[in-house]
A protein has these predicted regions:
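Conserved hydrolase catalytic core segment
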Residues: 1-33
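Short, well-ordered alpha-helices that flank and scaffold nucleotide-derived cofactor binding pockets
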Residues: 4-9, 147-150, 181
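Non-transmembrane alpha-helical segments in soluble domains
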Residues: 67-71, 149, 176, 180-183
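Alpha/beta-hydrolase
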Residues: 33, 38-124, 128
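Conserved loop-alpha-helix segment in the C-terminal half of the alpha/beta-hydrolase fold
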Residues: 113, 120-163
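Catalytic active-site module of serine/aspartate enzymes centered on a nucleophile-bearing elbow/loop
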Residues: 154-188
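Short aromatic-enriched loop/helix-cap "lid" or pocket-rim segments at secondary-structure transitions
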Residues: 29-34, 145, 170-172
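Short, solvent-exposed loop/turn segments at secondary-structure junctions
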Residues: 12, 25-26, 137-139, 164-165
């Protein structure tokens, strides 16, 4: 999101290329796509999430369990194997207050300060070559990624088959190779 806003609003000189990895140009489109993903969940999980959204109570254990399943399906594993990189296995400090303020209680209910982030119509203003990366099961759904690809004139889209929001973890060798080749081609 930040790179989109920066390139569109400030039109900085000296930027040779941009990389948008599982980002989005529109909070409303993002929310719409998360709600589409929700329809693929069990009826029980859908009901728990719908109840939380309707009441504003995001503390119910049924909701929390449903949201965990949603995030595991579309973001990342809730636990990693012992041999995973340390940055994935160490205990995380959650920035719940900042996340709630900026975005909202979850990925599909944007109520924070970014809820009105809408840049689809301004994507053609991005002139820098832009690499867009996403996974097939990503929070950044193929529709969200394709919207950026269609809107940014000089863009390339790499879709990671079977990957979620953290494609850089799920297929790290391909991800690193892709970024290295992109930067060699555009930023040297």
């Amino acid at each position: 999101m930040l790179i989109i806003e920066y390139l569109v609003n400030y039109k900085p000189e000296g930027i040779k290329s941009a990389i948008i990895s599982s980002g989005h140009p529109s909070s409303s489109l993002w929310s719409q796509e998360q709600h589409r993903w929700l329809k693929l969940m069990s009826a029980e999980d859908q009901a728990a999430i719908a109840k939380a959204e309707a009441t504003g109570d995001f503390s119910d254990p049924a909701y929390l369990a449903a949201n965990d399943r949603f995030m595991e399906r579309h973001c990342c594993p809730l636990t990693y194997p012992a041999d995973a990189p340390e940055c994935l296995t160490r205990e995380k400090k959650h920035g719940d207050e900042a996340y709630l303020y900026g975005w909202g209680p979850n990925e599909y209910t944007p109520t924070g300060t970014l809820k009105d982030f809408e840049y689809i119509d301004r994507l053609p203003e991005i002139k820098e070559p832009t690499l867009i990366i996403s996974g097939t099961y990503d929070l950044c759904s193929p529709l969200v990624a394709k919207t950026m690809y269609d809107g940014i004139p000089n863009s390339r889209w790499e879709l990671f088959e079977g990957a979620r929001h953290m494609c850089f973890v799920e297929d790290n060798p391909r991800y690193v190779k892709l970024l290295s080749e992109w930067m060699r081609e555009h930023d040297d």
